[in-house]
Amino acid sequence: MKKTIPVVGMACSACSANVERKLNSLEGISSASVNLAGRSALVDFDPTQISLEQMKKEISGIGYDLVIEADRSVEEIEKREYILLRRKTLLSWVFALLVMSVSMGWAGITDRYVANQLSLILALCNMLYCGRQFYVSAWKQLTHLTANMDTLVALSTLIAFLFSAFNTFWGDAVWGARSIEWHTYFDASVMIITFVLTGRLLEEKAKDGTASSIRQLMGMAPKTAHIVDGDSVEEVPLSTIEKGDMLEVRAGEKVPVDGEVTWAESFMTPDAAYVDESMITGEPTPAEKRQGSKVLAGTIPSQGKFRMRALQIGEETALAHIIRMVQEAQSSKAPVQRLVDKAALVFVPVVGSIALITFLAWWLAGGNAYLPQAVMSAVAVLVIACPCAMGLATPTALMVGIGKAAERQVLIKDASALEQLRKVDAVMIDKTGTLTLPNRSVDFTKSDDLPPEQRETLKPYAREAMEELQKKGIEIYMMSGDKEEAARYWADKAGIRHYRSQVLPQDKENMVKRLQAEGKTVAMVGDGINDTQALALADVGMAIGRGTDVAMDVAQVTLMGDDLRSIPEAVTLSRKTVRMIWENLFWAFVYNIVCIPLAAGALRLFGIDFQITPMWASALMAFSSVSVVLNSLRLRLTH
């Protein structure tokens, strides 16, 4: 079975890579994919071999937490963690200002020994409370021979603190005796923690925006329902509803579960109510619901009220299926992310090695006189290196892109489908049920004597959608079972140049193969069982949400409504999302490639007296992560 499990405690790509590696190493788990931005793990496992409790225990051992308890709200946990993070950040700034005041002489303390001891106490308090999680996490990583961003922060601040503490008590005896000027760097150790915490606080706030789509979907389900018990109607928690229960839904309330209408009334119609299903199907016109009509959880009666029998509850509802599909898609990984994950696993050890080389280079070049410079250069390298930006580059863009698509009633199954969708240059579209609808104004007949326009109606905006696709350089091929004359009529009406008439399911499959042989990336759009072969074979299968379950199971993309303009929208969104991923990765890698040498003091080799200090290194590192998240959020504003 597949399950999306919230993960607490991840801070960088090395964290998510460690959790993923641990999960994949457990017996009974066939695959696991961890999403840093979504703070979740998509796990495919055999519940007879491994339980959620066992997974939780294993992950807790490496310093993280899986939220598996039904009574623990993920939102509450995240809110509590955010409040704690904010408190620690504010307090860390207080410690930072106090240490800066003492070390800079602003506090009026002229005795160097007293000033250093006071700075030591303040820095130690900051480390033990505000920075405690860095050291706990680093220790747990060390016991499992792994490393993450917390390892770099813990190592850099400990080095700066211990070197400063050594100088506080033995500086004059060791360095003064050799006429070497010495300093303390308590301000650096405090500011590193302060800037890292500030960065994480801003990052968490920004990441909330990437998850807004899924929260919006989850918010569509009400917390309570009105259950009918004889002549009385009682409001009860949604969790208490069972299959077969009779419920009452009034105008403006959210339908609590999927079910069947048993009675309805409204001001306009005595035996019908009208339900707004736009959030599910995208249709702006309220749907008429009479006795026997199906209603979906999350939809809202706009006129009248009705009673219904609960048929699907909890995880069985269509809304729950949509939420689960979006969560799984957001937790999936684009091909490039797997390379980033591999890089993340070696990133921290490589940075540690560079810091050690930096230290040795400065020390060997200048001897003991350059020891303070060597230590601070190594600390700056440890601090400025940022696997967080690399780890957030892909998942934040994916979360925004896939979430934005869901808001437009387009459900994308996974990241690979999104990647393929941007490459599409040929679209095959089934005519009946996809491009057209049966004409309800006349009695339907299969007689070919009726003109095409009397038998079917072109879907609203179908021609506009086809024109938009062609503007993007995409060729369209209409597939019809009609005779040549009728097929040509509908192709002309929809503005489609290429069409095939009298096609069978096998012909659609052969057409996909032919286009692929010509080097095209093919998307197939269909709604019926006779489209499933072509949907499965195409590079991207796109099913109409009102089609058959078989078609939707095979397809990588599901269009929830009848508005075909969602097809070009999906293509545009996929292109923007993938472009955003590469932008994020480019800047994340450029940041590390440029900043690490600058922190090491490489410019001094060329006579340029410039080097990034540990304090500024921590500020840059924090900014790099936040900038990646904010860049991804541009998708919400530009599409």
Regions found by a protein language model. Name each.
Residues 108-111, 143, 162, 177, ...:
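Membrane-embedded alpha-helical bundles of multi-pass transporters
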Residues 175, 188-251, 289, 411-413, ...:
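Juxtamembrane coupling segments of multi-pass membrane pumps/enzymes
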Residues 84-224, 342, 454, 612-614:
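Transmembrane helix-loop-helix hairpins at the membrane interface
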Residues 280, 339, 376, 386-458, ...:
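Conserved catalytic phosphorylation-site environment of P-type ATPases
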Residues 75-94, 117, 137-160, 323-355, ...:
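Soluble-to-membrane junctions at the N-terminal ends of transmembrane alpha-helices
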Residues 1-116, 216, 232, 320, ...:
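Flexible metal-binding regulatory segments at protein termini and peripheral loops
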Residues 17, 412, 422, 435, ...:
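Conserved ATP-binding TGD loop and adjacent catalytic N/P-domain core of P-type ATPases
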